[in-house]
């Protein structure tokens, strides 16, 4: 087997409109317009897609509730980490700075999925 590309990650959300407000409004991701026969949306960044699929029961895995970076998470690069932190806090989203000492922080989407933002 020879893998040639990473295509997408799909995550489930309870309320699609609320999730879109976060992924589009706060993170600024661009919607990929696609006809779906179920409630969901696709986003694309850097050639990789994120699929949000609405489900009534969402339980993000959180084996380490105290160190968010040691849990399953999506990771994004940002130009200005301080600005990203300020925008997340202003929008009411929790922020946990990386304990590794690098320029990174973690936040949670409305369903509790963890996202890492790193300044690279």
Task: Please report, for each region that a protein language model flagged, where it lies by residue.
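N-terminal beta-strand motif that seeds the catalytic metal site of vicinal oxygen chelate
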Residues: 1-18, 71-76
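Vicinal oxygen chelate
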Residues: 2, 85-120
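Core segments of cupin and vicinal oxygen chelate
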Residues: 12-50
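Short acidic/glycine-enriched loop/turn segments that link adjacent beta-strands
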Residues: 36-39, 70, 100-103
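A short, acidic/glycine-rich surface segment
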Residues: 57-63
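Mid-chain, well-packed structural core segment of small domains
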Residues: 67-88
